[in-house]
Amino acid sequence: MSETSPKLRAELDGVPAYVPGKPAAAGGPVAYKLSSNENPYPPLPGVLESALAAAGSFNRYPDMACTGLMNELADRFGVPLGHLATGTGSVGVAQQLLQATSGPGDEVIYAWRSFEAYPIITQVSGATSVKVPLTDGEVHDLDAMAEAITDRTRLIFVCNPNNPTGTVVRRAELERFLDRVPSDVLVVLDEAYKEFIRDAEVPDGIEIYRDRPNVAVLRTFSKAYGLAGLRVGFAVAHEPVAAALRKTAVPFGVSQLAQDAAVASLRAEDELLGRVGSLVAERTRVSAELTRQGWTVPESHANFVWLRLGERTLDFAGACERAGVVVRPFQGEGVRVSIGEGEGNDLFLKAAEAFRAEL
């Protein structure tokens, strides 16, 4: 037998592994998982019923065109059907965008730290990441990002709100930035946490896209809508980009169960708003208490908060786990803490206060 192995793409060498939020230990002392920005509420009304109905046809392929969901989204956001594309969560659509735009020799710009998947999917595409550090206030440095554009730049991610810091880019600064971006460079507004924003100065990306052919918007059903386990997201973009997304989509990638659940979730708007409102109130409470304890907490516009801890990051995460909550550490940088059930949030706050008392 030959000792050589199949030849693989060199671009995959050194691709960083995506690190998911650590789960709560089964049967152990840890009771609350605040590590993955999941919605703590059960599925919205009508979702389980739609899922059960879809379960009866698991022997059939799903609607590859996602017709029902696409029509619902077109009506909801007032966009043409040809400007929509679906995928396996917003990260799946982001990967499709890179497949459509970027390859070896191309550059992809994004802030750092930002969404952990960006460097992974960029390297898999063969393109080169250009990471632009956040400002001291943990927000996108849009001036520096604009200055980083070269003739090799093909795509720019703007995560708004930013994961994991929760900070936002407001309308005036975003418009100034977009005016500096060449028309042949695609700007992707990643709005996975859009529903949690309460600042009127933070623009709706779909309104921005309407007049800018080089802007695409990503949304997901994983966060506010509570469908993280079903993997369904979508993009809104002008026809050439949306058409390319449909070409790069995995055939039958979005299950029928996910499609039907997403439609049912869209139709449960009142309940959704109530749940999101409760999570925003908890976010405000948690942020205020952390500030009272003496922590520096960037203003969050998502369903999580960020603490920059540097070398103390893993110690803090360990203290939280011993107290009964799992948070998401980014070694040497800080921790992201999802807003969950009130009891879990209280346990986290107690752990944070105890840790600070020992500093």
UniProtKB/Swiss-Prot annotation:
GO biological processes: L-histidine biosynthetic process
UniProt enzyme class: transferase
E.C. no: 2.6.1.57
A UniProt-annotated Pfam family: Aminotran_1_2
Reactions accelerated catalytically: an aromatic L-alpha-amino acid + 2-oxoglutarate = an aromatic oxo-acid + L-glutamate
Cofactor needs: pyridoxal 5'-phosphate
Residue numbers bearing the N6-(pyridoxal phosphate)lysine modification: K223
MF (Gene Ontology): aromatic-amino-acid transaminase activity; histidinol-phosphate transaminase activity; pyridoxal phosphate binding
Keywords: Aminotransferase, Pyridoxal phosphate, Transferase
Keyword Glycosyltransferase: no
Top-level lineage group: Bacteria
Role, per record: Aminotransferase that catalyzes the conversion of aromatic amino acids and 2-oxoglutarate into corresponding aromatic oxo acids and L-glutamate.
Complexes and interactors: Homodimer.
Family named by the database record: Belongs to the class-II pyridoxal-phosphate-dependent aminotransferase family.
Identification of the protein by name: Aromatic amino acid aminotransferase
Provenance organism: Streptomyces griseus subsp. griseus (strain JCM 4626 / CBS 651.72 / NBRC 13350 / KCC S-0626 / ISP 5235)
